[in-house]
Amino acid sequence: WFHFNDNGAMSTGWISPNGHWYYLSDNGAMTTGWARVDGSWYYFDTTGAMRSSTWVSNGGQWFYLEGSGAMAAGKWISPDGHWYYADRTGAMVTGWKQIDGAWYFFHGNGVMASGWQQISGAWYYLGGNGAMTTGWQQIGGAWYYFNSDGAMATKKWIEGTFYVDDSGAMLVSTTRTIDGWNYTFDGNGRWITVNNGGYSCPAWAPIKGNASSKIYHRPGNQSYDITKPEACFSTGTQAEAAGYHAAKR
């Protein structure tokens, strides 16, 4: 198809004779399908009309044409109140994608995920802006720890001091049996005592504390072997923070 203006001259470039936009090549032929014009990609339907503010499928992938008709590429878009990301080729992203140093997850329909998400069997927390979180995060009043890959840690010691249970929440102000040992955690989640009811303490917490006297005994102290601990500590500083004093011998 060709277009001739009122003077009978053949039209080229952009024209809008009926409220729709068309693009005519240098030889005047009407463009259909995909075309690159002035550095941007556009899509023209079978009638030659430029499509805009809509998704177009091509080769099994989806592309978004903005209000100007130009294909979105390498940018965030929100055509319907949800967030999507068009990669540098213009294709709608699904699955995990690293953008400007942060990781995001996009559902199969391209919508950016946020908040709690279970993905491939693991739990992740994607903040209000959708970015994957790592490390400690306080969510809904509880503390959670997310590994470097973003997966929430469960039933695991963190930094040798804190413990997250099977729900992922850090234990606070409670006593819990873990691997046969009774641990007491303070209001900040730090474990302050550990005991199994016997005469021994674990190798990583060898200091014995006597609850009635508030005295702690280090390995090598005279009464260490005959002391039955009510509490075990990893360091003297930890014992003293719990109100215990060092034995004199």
Model-derived regions, located:
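Extracellular adhesion/carbohydrate-binding repeat motifs centered on closely spaced tryptophans
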Residues: 1-215, 224-226
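Compact, charge-rich alpha-helical regulatory domains located at protein termini
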Residues: 218-249
